[in-house]
């Protein structure tokens, strides 16, 4: 039976995301666990177009966008030391972390 831990990291700023990824990878490598990644996932770009004036000048518009960057880390056969190391990692405020546990049979 082979277990995996998948860690998905999301952020609006790619520099903060890369720094958080390096911190997690270094913490996991200290426990001598087998890690795959970081795997860069496709970024999602949301674009919004709004009128500059409320009533007239329909052709005058302004565009805004939000870029969401994502990374994936996969840990094969994690041991309790990996879980302990992950709980002690302190990340920046702009990074969203989702941890998934997969048990293979």
UniProtKB/Swiss-Prot annotation:
Gene Ontology CC terms, in alphabetical order: ribonucleoprotein complex; ribosome
Designated name of the protein: Small ribosomal subunit protein uS10
Origin: domain of life: Bacteria
Any single biological process term in GO: translation
Quaternary context: Part of the 30S ribosomal subunit.
Pfam family, one: Ribosomal_S10
A single MF term (Gene Ontology): structural constituent of ribosome
């Amino acid at each position: 039976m082979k277990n995996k831990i998948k860690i998905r990291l999301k952020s609006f700023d790619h520099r903060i995301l890369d720094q958080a990824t390096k911190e997690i990878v270094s913490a996991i490598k200290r426990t001598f666990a087998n890690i795959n990644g970081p795997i860069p996932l496709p970024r999602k770009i949301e674009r919004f177009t709004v009128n500059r004036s409320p009533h007239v000048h329909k052709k005058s518009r302004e565009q805004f966008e939000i870029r969401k960057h994502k990374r994936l880390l996969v840990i094969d056969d994690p041991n309790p030391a990996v879980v302990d190391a992950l709980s002690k990692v302190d990340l920046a405020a702009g990074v969203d972390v989702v941890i998934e546990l997969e048990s293979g049979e």
